Amino acid sequence: MKRKWIKWVSWILLTPLILFVILMVLLYIPPVQNFLRKEAAAYASEATGMQINVRRIDLRFPLNLLVRGVEVIQAPDTLLSLESLNVHVQALPLFRGKVEVDDISLQQVAVNSANLIDGMRLKGVLGSFRLESHGVDLPNEIAIINRAELSDTHVQLLLNDTTATPKDTAQSEVRWKVDLRHLKLKNVSFSMQLPADSMRLAAHVEEAQVNDAEADLKNLHYGLRSFLVSGTSVNYDVGTAEPAEGFDPSHIALRDIRIGLDSMYYRGRNMNAVIREFSMNDRSGLSVTSLTGRVFANDTIIQVPSLKLLTPHSEMDLTAQTYWELSLIHISEPT
């Protein structure tokens, strides 16, 4: 009798665990995944009033998720189109409050906010995005991003209403520390338009790289080892009038921008930046062949030990120093 009682108690205690294990195993079976995909898409469509389609969902052990062929349609607009999303996360570190991301990749994404957001419309396409992160510590608010790559991405922002919104006075302290080891951009552009004053801003980056960047959001400390951007253009236009001859502040068109910076950091009054290279051309004919130098500051002084500017027709050397109250600037004569 006692053995039978122990047996029944054991079954009662083990049944929820067994059911949970069976459920988890079922999630990895393709027919079950296909059924859940259809049911989830149908439920989401009914709840949102939109047409939501998902061509394929594939979950592989332990946490490797592949989603293909996602469409979100609110006639006549397609709000979201996604060719593929792949998320590969290690399972065991999650039980320790850590996130180890082997790979997150997005391919061929198109977004159109239509009228979902008051006062603005966002449209864009994303060609490819990849992220690898080993060292996200949720309890201690630390994130290490080993690699992030973004390419063939173009975003348009149209602001229909520039009325200022009430400022949110609620404050929450952000304590995260972010360590970005490597970031690469290729063929990325952004444009913004404010119809109220006909202001248009557009920027295109052909290639950009950031290495060893750090951000301590609690203490407001920032730094990076190197930054390089090339093949960049920036356009700024206000009004509908044709650009005036020469330099026109209402119509600025910079092209062939190349910027190289090293050893940058910002910690309150402690700042440093090495300008390794800078060059650009403007629509008006203004051209900077080269700009190199260094900027340095601490609790006592702000100093430009050397800054050299070269244009096609002139050269200028600059040194400057200030003690936050008094300044001494020396500029050599152009040659």
Regions found by a protein language model. Give the residues of each.
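N-terminal type II signal-anchor transmembrane helix
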Residues: 1-49
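Flexible beta-edge/linker motif
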Residues: 56-160, 172-195, 204, 211-237, ...
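Transmembrane beta-strand segments that form the barrel wall of outer-membrane beta-barrel proteins
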Residues: 275-278, 301-307
